[in-house]
């Protein structure tokens, strides 16, 4: 049974509770907190995105689970929460990127794209007949030679980080980052740190089939997802340490 003070205020997205809360937005955040763990790390020569795909059945094909998406040549995102909602935002981000390229003959700025997505997410907290997006994104990319890492929120909030995590293992991830993050680290070291954080978040319950990694670096300033063989080589190092 709902508390007396809460009854009625969580049924409409446009109604504030007496203490200034939008319960539907808070419930959407809970969907993110229950989602799989995703981490992003900005380092000296690039950005790394890593996700735990949480394969719950041996009958499931791990390759069918996608949590890291390429938006444009220079931008990639990782998601946590409702996968369908994440795909909807990914499709919108791709369209925004294409429109910018056609209109201005240039790649869209990472921060501009992030703000456009958050503006869109915010509208779903303000009008009736819709619900907030039950997903959060880590948006990583390069603009004007600078690496940028942003985190979105179901409320439309946008924050920039050096290293962060979303999903059920966020607290464990942030503890590892606060103790060991080094902005001068290489891509290789950042990947190993990200895997160490995922290892802590999942209590060691991950392997090459459940980990997905995406990178953008100075060598090839384009976002790409690592192959299974590349992921396996890094996972082995964590398992042996």
UniProtKB/Swiss-Prot annotation:
<dbReference type="Pfam" id="PF00227">
    <property type="entry name" value="Proteasome"/>
</dbReference>
<keyword id="KW-0963">Cytoplasm</keyword>
<comment type="subunit">
    <text>The 20S proteasome core is composed of 14 alpha and 14 beta subunits that assemble into four stacked heptameric rings, resulting in a barrel-shaped structure. The two inner rings, each composed of seven catalytic beta subunits, are sandwiched by two outer rings, each composed of seven alpha subunits. The catalytic chamber with the active sites is on the inside of the barrel. Has a gated structure, the ends of the cylinder being occluded by the N-termini of the alpha-subunits. Is capped at one or both ends by the proteasome regulatory ATPase, PAN.</text>
</comment>
<keyword id="KW-0647">Proteasome</keyword>
<dbReference type="InterPro" id="IPR001353">
    <property type="entry name" value="Proteasome_sua/b"/>
</dbReference>
<dbReference type="InterPro" id="IPR000426">
    <property type="entry name" value="Proteasome_asu_N"/>
</dbReference>
<comment type="function">
    <text>Component of the proteasome core, a large protease complex with broad specificity involved in protein degradation.</text>
</comment>
<dbReference type="InterPro" id="IPR050115">
    <property type="entry name" value="Proteasome_alpha"/>
</dbReference>
<dbReference type="GO" id="GO:0010498">
    <property type="term" value="P:proteasomal protein catabolic process"/>
</dbReference>
<protein>
    <recommendedName>
        <fullName>Proteasome subunit alpha</fullName>
    </recommendedName>
</protein>
<dbReference type="InterPro" id="IPR019982">
    <property type="entry name" value="Proteasome_asu_arc"/>
</dbReference>
<comment type="similarity">
    <text>Belongs to the peptidase T1A family.</text>
</comment>
<dbReference type="InterPro" id="IPR023332">
    <property type="entry name" value="Proteasome_alpha-type"/>
</dbReference>
<dbReference type="GO" id="GO:0006511">
    <property type="term" value="P:ubiquitin-dependent protein catabolic process"/>
</dbReference>
<dbReference type="GO" id="GO:0019773">
    <property type="term" value="C:proteasome core complex, alpha-subunit complex"/>
</dbReference>
<dbReference type="Pfam" id="PF10584">
    <property type="entry name" value="Proteasome_A_N"/>
</dbReference>
<dbReference type="GO" id="GO:0004298">
    <property type="term" value="F:threonine-type endopeptidase activity"/>
</dbReference>
<dbReference type="GO" id="GO:0005737">
    <property type="term" value="C:cytoplasm"/>
</dbReference>
<dbReference type="InterPro" id="IPR029055">
    <property type="entry name" value="Ntn_hydrolases_N"/>
</dbReference>
